[in-house]
Structure formats: C-alpha cells, structure tokens
C-alpha cells in the first residue's frame, strides 16, 4: 500500500471525507473534511511515491479525543503552531510552538488531543525508500 492509499484508508475509516481542493491548500495533495460529528476543519496530505509525505492539520475536536495510528516505517517530524494534548508512548506534552518527532512502524502512535483547541500543524514523514535508497543513488 502506498503512502497516499495508507492515509486515504485511515482517514476515511476515521470519518474524514475527501473534498474538493480549496485555494488555501495545494491541489497536488488530497484534502479531507473532518467528521462533522466529532470535529471541524481539514486534513491535507501529499504523498510522493513511497518516498515521503507532507501533512497539514487544521481542525479541532468537540471533545477530548484519543488517536491511535499504526504508521508505516518512517521518520515523522511535525511542527505544531497550535495544539493542546499529550503523546502517550512515550508520554510528552503537546503544546503550541513545539516540534515533535517519532520513528513509526514499530508501535502505534497514541495521543490525546484536547477539545476546542485547534490542531494546526505541518509535518513531513520520510520513508526508508527515500533515506536508504533514493539519497544513496543520487
């Protein structure tokens, strides 16, 4: 499963709905509308083959929300412009202005996001095909 398909599957199972592109987001990626029952806002993702993806979160939850996601193997780096919550494995606070990273593919990413606080972030995930093969070949 490719990067784009992974996020499309996870987001739609979580209630997000793919929507038309907006002038606020690059049309090269896919834009998803948050599930209206639990959140308000958008999730944008652009995947480049099996090399990397770029994600933008811009939504908030109506209630404190627990997220559990088994990511493919990758190095994930995210800057949070706005957030309030906790990463659970290992425990770390999520606060505005922080940069968080994790190495995915081994255990589920688990976090709690607090209600009515915007989750605004930009992240990149770099996959083994990029840092083990693509860069070496260049």
Language-model features, listed with the residues they occupy:
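General N-terminal leader/first-domain-start detector
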Residues: 1-42, 47-52
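N-terminal regulatory/effector-sensing and dimerization cores
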Residues: 30-138
């Amino acid at each position: 499963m490719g990067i784009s398909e992974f996020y499309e599957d996870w987001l739609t199972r979580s209630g997000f709905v793919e929507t038309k592109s907006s002038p606020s987001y690059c049309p090269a990626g896919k834009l998803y509308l948050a599930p209206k029952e639990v959140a308000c806002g958008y999730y944008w993702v652009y995947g480049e083959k099996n090399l990397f993806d770029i994600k933008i979160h811009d939504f908030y939850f109506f209630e404190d929300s627990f997220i559990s996601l088994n990511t493919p193997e990758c190095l994930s780096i995210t800057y949070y412009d706005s957030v309030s919550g906790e990463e659970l494995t290992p425990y770390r606070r999520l606060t505005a202005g922080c940069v968080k990273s994790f190495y995915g593919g081994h255990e589920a990413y688990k976090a709690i996001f607090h209600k009515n606080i915007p989750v605004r972030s930009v992240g990149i995930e770099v996959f083994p095909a990029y840092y083990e093969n693509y860069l070496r070949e260049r």
